[in-house]
Amino acid sequence: MSKLNRACAVVAITGAVLAAAIPGWGAETSVGGVNGQAARGKQLYRRYCVGCHGAKGDGQGENGVYMEPRPRDFTTGTFKCRSTPTGTLPLDTDVYATIGRGLVASSMPSWSALTAQERADLLAFIKDFSPRWAVEKPEPPLAIPPEPPDTPESVTRGGKVYERMECWKCHGKDGSGNGPSATTLTDSKDRPIVPYDFTKGTRFKCGRTNEDLYKIFMTGLDGTPMPSFKDNLPPDEAWDLVHYLRTLQVKVKK
């Protein structure tokens, strides 16, 4: 069999697997007035995503098995970056933003080169992997209060919050992800996972703004050991913690 025929066979098999694997829950998808269509998203997924996330959307793609952290398993309906409470489905805008932004400290790149329509279509197809979208609705997003001034006093208070909430046990005293518990952590699939290193770059796992980091504190990162602190951390202390963590970053761009 020639290389061309083998390539065509792989494409045909992948398409057949995709067709058989996706039940099509028909979840509605709309972002900023752009309605996603799973049929179009299927073709985009085959082109851009199947190599890592797999034909079944379970994160077991041909390339995905070599990646750390592993690609997202869409069949569980569990997502790290959300504006909704822990344990709940994300908003369409949450997943749409992740597609466009990518995920720091992972192999997930930014797909901002795709049009708004293409990203909405891709989102519609991704939602078809999990039955949760057919029976659950995302809860209302977290209300984010206005950010108070980033002052030296706020940073000092944030450092005390970092100590009191024992963030250092995972993220380390200097925020570099080398805490005493770091080597023992596992994700929801019992695979080793490393804490985020706050000292690298100017972005966080789910974005680059202070609001993005605030949301992580209050919603947690589902599928990882990072919990939600919504019930234990008052908003003003969460903002202090944001300001403190900013001081750990190298060459922060104001």
Name the predicted role of every residue range:
Residues 2-12:
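Bacterial N-terminal signal peptides that target proteins for export
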Residues 58-59, 176-177, 235:
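Short, non-ligating residues that shape and space the ligands of small metal-coordination modules
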Residues 35-54, 150-176, 183-188:
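Sequence/structural segment immediately N-terminal to covalent heme-attachment motifs in c-type
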Residues 25-44, 133-163, 202, 252-254:
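Electrostatic cytochrome c docking/interface patches
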Residues 10-20:
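Bacterial N-terminal signal peptides
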Residues 65-112, 119-126, 184-233, 238-246:
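Extracytoplasmic electron-transfer domains, predominantly the class I c-type cytochrome c fold
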